[in-house]
UniProtKB/Swiss-Prot annotation:
One of its GO terms (cellular component) is cytoplasm. This is DNA replication and repair protein RecF. ATP binds at G30, S31, N32, G33, Q34, G35, K36, T37. GO terms for molecular function: ATP binding; single-stranded DNA binding. Signal peptide: none annotated. Keywords: ATP-binding, Cytoplasm, DNA damage, DNA repair, DNA replication, DNA-binding, Nucleotide-binding, SOS response. Belongs to the RecF family. The keyword Aminoacyl-tRNA synthetase does not apply. It is found in: Cytoplasm. It holds the Pfam family SMC_N. It comes from the Bacteria. InterPro entries: DNA-binding_RecF, DNA-binding_RecF_CS, P-loop_NTPase, RecF/RecN/SMC_N, RecF_2.
Length: 404
């Protein structure tokens, strides 16, 4: 799959932007703060319904505007598809596919991308929440129906936490909470699907991760990934603010039927402590993935270069997995300001690793940072304006309209 045309209205620093895109590599180049990352951020939003830079949609709407619009013309095997999302400041977001209204969470069914940015170093060095988000985004891109499962789990978790907080405030005992049993069952039923799906995903990622790491780093440091499950922990961690999970190796759980009894036992075991804390202490929202290099945890032991190579390999492995599974061609691969962070050898190896993808979109502040064969088609960005780009294809006006 490739993006033939991207159109933005009131997105970030763009009042309006239109750019035609070609197969192969396209380089968006411009000084920092000019808006090049905003273009690829918009495409990332279409496939993940989130930004790699901010946690709230509001920041994506241009100051003074009430909504932002992202439109893309997609092409695969000679067929075209128009997708659109309207991000609203004071109402729910809206979406269209070929002018037909749809739920925003359905968009990943039609468009997949894998974006790598400097912020992704936190996948190796940061908190578990980022690693969970990586897995869940990839789950939805591979199996779109899981977007509903993840949403259902969040709702059940919120309801259960509300009940636990209320019970703590009123000093209620465990045997006085019949309603909690209902939410326990629902949390276990939904959460077990997520745990199993993540486990199967990590298992599928492993061989691709090993190949991608070797391609980027040029050495085999034995990269590995293993799920760590809070339902297996005796102590799930005291500091929920810091997101310390206390989870244990759960690599064997790839079927929800195997997870259910273990999750059920963990919920029962932790109920007294959860009533004390007013918080659900076990479940997929508290899990992690342990990354290792040379048998040691990458977090805390890997060098800066090794951490970069591991993070890059994770994204390349994700892209290869989507490419292998997809019936609509390769995911669009997005490299946001990546080459500036790499030495010359890694730049060359990364360029070689991404060359085979149908479409690769790259941003850079310095033209010379990007290997020449990836920079042949350059789009220059200056002060929120696109210059020196191919003439945009005919597209609907991005101003005034929105997703119906």
């Amino acid at each position: 799959m490739i993006v033939r045309h991207l159109s933005l209205g009131d997105f970030r620093n763009y009042t309006r932007a239109d750019v035609a895109l070609l197969p192969g590599a396209t380089l968006f180049v411009g000084s920092n703060g000019q808006g090049k990352t905003n273009l690829v951020e918009a495409l990332g939003f279409l496939s993940t319904l989130g930004s790699h830079r901010v946690s709230t949609d509001q920041a994506l709407i241009r100051q003074g505007a009430e909504s932002a619009v992202i439109r893309a013309l997609l092409q695969h095997a000679g067929r075209e598809l128009r997708v659109e999302v309207q991000i609203n400041r004071s109402a729910a977001n809206r979406a269209q596919v070929n002018s037909t209204p749809t739920k925003p969470r359905e968009l990943p069914r039609y468009f997949s991308s894998v974006l790598f940015a400097p912020e992704d170093l936190a996948l190796v060095r940061g908190d578990p929440s980022g690693r969970r988000r990586l897995l869940d985004q990839l789950l939805v891109l591979r199996t779109p129906r899981l977007a509903g499962v993840l949403s259902d789990y969040d709702r059940a978790l919120k309801q259960r936490n509300t009940l636990l907080k209320s019970a703590r405030a009123r000093g209620m005992k465990a045997d006085q909470l019949g309603t909690l049993d209902i939410w326990d069952e629902r949390l276990v039923a939904i959460g077990s699907q997520i745990i199993a799906a993540r486990g199967a995903l990590v298992e599928a990622l492993q061989p691709e991760l090993a190949r991608a790491y070797l391609a980027v780093a040029g050495s085999d440091h034995g990269p590995s990934a293993r799920p760590e499950l809070s339902i297996l922990a005796d102590d799930p961690g005291e500091d929920d603010i810091a997101d310390e999970t206390g989870a244990r190796d759960g690599g064997r759980f790839t079927r929800s039927d195997d997870v259910v009894p273990v999750f059920t036992a963990a919920i029962a075991r932790m109920r007294p402590r959860e009533l004390e804390r007013g918080l659900t202490l076990v479940g997929p929202h508290r899990d992690d993935v342990l990354f290792r290099l040379n048998g040691l945890p990458a977090k805390g032991y890997a060098s800066h270069g090794e951490s970069w190579s591991f993070a890059l390999a994770l994204k390349l492995a994700s892209a290869e997995l989507l490419r292998r599974d997809s019936q609509t061609g390769d995911p669009v691969l997005i490299l946001d300001d990546v080459f500036a962070e790499l030495d010359q050898a890694r730049r060359g190896r990364l360029a070689e690793a991404v060359t085979g993808f149908e479409q690769v979109l790259i941003t850079a502040a310095v033209f010379e940072d990007v290997p020449a064969h990836l920079a042949a088609n350059a789009v220059h960005i200056r002060a929120g304006e696109i210059v020196d780009a191919p003439a945009p294809a005919s597209e609907p006006d991005a101003e005034g309209g929105g997703a119906a």
